[in-house]
């Protein structure tokens, strides 16, 4: 744990995630990139928004690994129920580009919340810019199961 010059412990710097406040049909909270990609898939983006999305999605793809290409079952609900990616606080170069995605969501009336946590869950994947965690209290016995209907 880091300490300040006075010898007391510094508060932990939190991980950051941007996600919908509402569960999707699989019981998960869709992240910021998925929310914008859903708008694109539904044909809702303007030409400028689509250009932004494609350009920045390519930039993110080049800037950091997709955890599922490194650990194929990282998002498998049977293995890691509710797994979600969080930015590390040191990933400032990645966080700087999120604002444009948030603007697109705001324009389209799509809710997206910023979450910060020093301990978002059990880490199942980690690299230099992100962690994927299973949220506390979400394991194979407590995994969300959508109601049939």
Where do the model's predicted regions map?
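Long, contiguous N-terminal structural blocks used for assembly/anchoring
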Residues: 1-85
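Intrinsically disordered, low-complexity boundary segments flanking structured domains
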Residues: 1-6, 99-100, 118-122
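Intrinsically disordered, low-complexity segments used for protein-protein interactions
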Residues: 14, 89, 132-134
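Extracellular-facing segments of soluble proteins and assemblies that are Gly/Ser/Thr-biased and enriched
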Residues: 87-111
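Acidic, proline/glycine-rich low-complexity IDRs
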Residues: 103-149
